[in-house]
Amino acid sequence: MLESSSKKIKNRKWWLILALPAWVYGVFLAVEVVVSLAVGALIKIGVPLNSVNSVIFNTVLSVVVYILSLIVVIGVPFLAKKRRTTLSNLGVNDWPTFLEIFISPFAFVAYFLLTMVTMSIASGVFSVDMQQKQAIPFSQSMLATHWQFIMAFVVLVVLVPIVEELLYRGYLYGKLRNSFSIWLSIIITSIAFGAAHLWVGPDSPLQWAVAVDTFTLSLVMCATREYTGAIWVPIMMHMAKNGIAFYFLFVNTGAINQTESLLPFIFM
């Protein structure tokens, strides 16, 4: 019995703990760089991308980066090593069940309460600035018409949650869970998800408040992924969070001053 469990521990591919998160995040960064260089090259040869409406431009850019990242993360291991990732591996083998829809609000409340604790600890112990906001591809001044609001909404509240959940709670958590325990898989996935929101560019400060909040969000979303076997609850939670942020940032901006001191983590 002891020999069997010791063999299992030895046979585990511990390098995956670093390799898988680095692969998911590294691909996303690489795709961003490649797309950015491609845009710069097109502008240099005379393609008038500078004259394109900023909302349309950022929407198209976001769609390209997110979809391409998903394709590369899943496709390259299959092409190179025949490591296939099925819909079942990603947690999307079936449509959302009534149970998943029912528990989503409760899971969101659990995250809400837990992040109040983690953000308080981060603020009190590590002096993290809780008023720090997440860098996003749209600003209030950019959105002037209904279709611009719709495009920003589709990117922030639909595209981003779906693709990020496929990458992190789907691909990353699923692959880690094949080799490691529930809690180790949850912790590694959540650290990776938080770290992915920490750095946004060489000219911007590290987003520590955002990293702590997204780490906490991931803990709850990974738990629901494990419980239900699917990523529908994480997707619904992620959409709800981004939807609330979208409402306060772009629709009812006057409410921010009244609620930001109480719930700063919502505006990320």
Predicted segments — roles?
Residues 19-23, 103-107, 151, 155-156, ...:
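Alpha-helical transmembrane segments of MFS and MFS-like solute carriers/permeases
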Residues 48-52, 60-63, 130-132, 164, ...:
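N-terminal start-of-chain detector that recognizes signal peptides
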Residues 91-94, 105, 189, 238:
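A general structural motif at alpha-helix termini
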Residues 97, 128, 132-136:
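Alpha-helix initiation/capping motif
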Residues 113-116, 134, 138-268:
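Transmembrane helix-loop-helix hairpins at the membrane interface
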Residues 44-52, 92, 126-131, 176-186:
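Membrane interface segments of multi-pass transport proteins and intramembrane proteases
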Residues 1-102, 109-112, 116, 120, ...:
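N-terminal, membrane-interfacial amphipathic/helix-forming hydrophobic leader that caps
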